[in-house]
Design a protein with these regions (language model features):
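Catalytic cores of TIM-barrel enzymes
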Residues: 1-383
Length: 383
């Protein structure tokens, strides 16, 4: 973890709104290990602590938050629960905006509750609105919104400075945007893992309707990303949450997951960008599906897969990476790290189409093991 390597706690970096601690952490990492590409603020919420406190999410815990709920060096933790209840499907599809405002938003955060009170039913007049927006709660919410905007503007300015520093050091940052499979959005944001699986049997029509209504806007969002300055050739990142082996059978996977993931991948390609597909969890049974894309255009990053099989199936179709278990970097010895790195290189390097990457982030790992990994790839991985 670059932050820990630089001597900072995760909490310190999350609450440093200048992003100077994050920048120093990244610069130290790049100077010490010289990887092939740079890093940005990533997904560790660097500099976002004060904004998170204002937003008050109910489904998230982060290092340094009031009450010290989790360890100062823990990555963020998410609490999954349904925001769309069993008896709300009709309301959800009839008026998604209203449902999102009055049902989902308060379940995710209390931040906008004063605003929601002003929007609920009854006769509207200038005087009634004036009374509602003059309450202490509403005024406090407005002040929080203004402060949140100030913090966000500062964050964006500092993030741009950080990226500029990385570029000037000679390291490209490839990521341009993001996308999501509709079923993942349904499961992650509305129903939760267990209920979304049950819904494949108990609420089949509702799942299908949500997916079909969501795929169009997702494809349009990708087209808009492709029109942004400098987008050509950049990565559009997608983390696949619910496509893992065993979560759903092959028939369900193809119908509710792969069909729309495939559409998104091809739309990213049409937009002259690169689909960066991070396959979370074990992905051995999904490899045949992953071959059904335009050859030479897709990058698959695996958390856990049989790389021999992945290489044999995808070698002429996509670039592959990952499946180096970071537990080895945390608990193993340098010699074990070197042996595993060599094994992966022997399997995946022949013929190209392989980028050496770990299966997940470098969190709480031994520095000597990271050094052993980088040295082995440089020495043993030469073509």
């Amino acid at each position: 973890c670059p932050m820990l390597n630089a001597g900072y706690t995760v909490a310190e970096v999350i609450y440093d709104t200048t992003l100077e601690k994050m920048e120093k952490s990244i610069v130290k990492y790049l100077e010490e290990f010289d990887p092939d590409c740079g890093l940005g603020t990533g997904t560790n919420y660097a500099g976002e602590g004060p904004m998170l406190e204002l937003e008050r999410p109910k489904n998230m815990r982060w290092a340094g938050m009031p009450g010290d709920v989790i360890d100062v060096n823990s990555i963020q933790q998410f609490i999954e629960y349904p925001t769309l209840l069993d008896d709300e499907f009709d309301e959800f599809f009839r008026d998604r905006t209203g449902w999102s405002l009055f049902k989902q938003a308060p379940r995710n955060s209390d931040f906008l509750v004063p605003l929601l009170k002003t929007l609920q039913g009854g006769r509207v007049s200038a005087r009634s609105v004036a009374a509602q927006v003059s309450t202490p709660e509403f005024k406090a919410m407005l002040e929080d919104l203004w402060r949140l905007n100030e913090l966000n503007q500062e964050y964006r300015k500092n993030a741009a400075r950080l990226n500029k520093t990385v570029y000037e050091m000679g390291y490209p940052v490839f990521r341009q945007g993001g996308a999501a499979v509709p079923f993942d959005s349904y499961s992650d944001g509305l129903r939760g893992t267990i209920l979304s699986l049950q819904d494949l049997y108990d609420h089949t029509e509702e799942v299908e309707r949500y997916i079909e209504e969501s795929i169009g806007p997702m494809l349009e969002m990708i087209r808009m990303q492709g029109k942004m300055p400098g987008a050509k050739g950049k990565h559009v990142f997608m983390a696949l949450h619910k496509g893992i082996d065993g979560f759903m059978g092959d028939e369900h996977y193809r119908k509710y997951y792969w069909k729309h993931l495939q559409m998104i991948i091809e739309e990213i390609i049409k937009a002259d960008m690169v689909p960066y597909i991070f396959c979370e969890g074990r992905y051995n049974t999904r490899l045949d599906c992953l071959t059904e894309v335009t050859p030479g255009k897709v990058f698959y990053h695996f958390e856990e897969v049989n790389m021999e099989v992945a290489k044999s199936k995808l070698k002429d179709i996509a670039c592959i990476a990952g499946s180096f278990n970071t537990n080895l970097l945390q608990f193993g010895k340098p010699e074990q790290v070197r042996d595993e790195a060599k094994r992966l290189l022997d399997i995946c390097a022949p013929g190209g189409g392989f980028i050496f990457m770990t299966g997940s982030g470098l969190s709480h790992v031994k520095k000597e093991n990271v050094v052993a990994m980088f040295d082995t790839v440089r020495e043993y991985g030469k073509y």
